[in-house]
Amino acid sequence: MRTAVSPDGIRWTAGPRGLLDEFVEHSSFYKYNGYYIVNGQTNEPWRKGEGGAPRGRQGFVYISPDFEHWLKESAESFALPEPIDPGERGLHKAYDQVHLGTAPLVYGNVAVGLTCIWRNRETFTDISGDFALVLSDDGIRFREPVKGHVYLHAEDSPVTGVPEKPYNTVLCQSNGILNVGDETRIYYGRWRNAWLPHGALSEDYYGEVALSVLPRDRWGSLEVDPGKEQGSVWSAPVTLPAEAFELRINADGTSGIRVELSDERFRLLPGYSGNDSGFVRQDGLDSPIVWPGEHPGELAGQTVRIRLRLERSDLVEPKLYAVYGVVQ
């Protein structure tokens, strides 16, 4: 891996070689909590699992505090389960592995993105790759909000085909997730797996760039359990901005949503809970929360938790996508 810098995004100067002691196939480069992070996969056979057993492809991060000095030590970022039998583990065994690590979009105190589920097979051209949704609270360790869920199947976004040749598609994530207006645009690779034995290439070996679009930040929704009429959820501790700010939500069915604030130990705050709970007047991608009691600006710089209560009715089906703190 090498760094590179540019004054204009067109002309680039490569940095020094030998930053790391291993081969890395990376999909993303981002900054989180002041650290520069490269997220990718490694195939190094010296990386062992439980009891010294072999491992398949898994995701790791490589970290720098200043972009110039990179830690020689890496950290596991996202890994899929290895087979129970250690003899069935390894790069060339037929089970799901992680390809290219994780490519996230950073939203301040959370990162949301995609990883590729590499459907490893003994015959290379039988391999395909689907996308899974992952998120992180520190930019290093990622997890699936719903374990085992395929966010985008390769067969639902296939690479341009070749007549009478049913090649598999491998979806490849990258630093191509952008918020543009009211959309989240996901640019990603579609790899036509036409690899031949012994690493030779055919004229069918090919890749292309694809685009999938979401309503902005609507990666998934939190809803009331189908068998219930109401439910609630707490946030992790959040330090509110020291300057003027506004809390907003990305939601539908907002007449069925109420917002409360507590201290870090879950004790609800007077003026921000109960009859003074916040509410939203309209559905939308960034709807302001209205507070009948105190304004959250009075809590500037303090650490709080956000509690959201959702209530379903015959006319309202609340769906929560995101909560924002917007500096004004």
Question: Which residues fall in each region the model found?
Answer:
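Carbohydrate-active catalytic/glycan-binding domains of CAZyme proteins
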Residues: M1-Q328
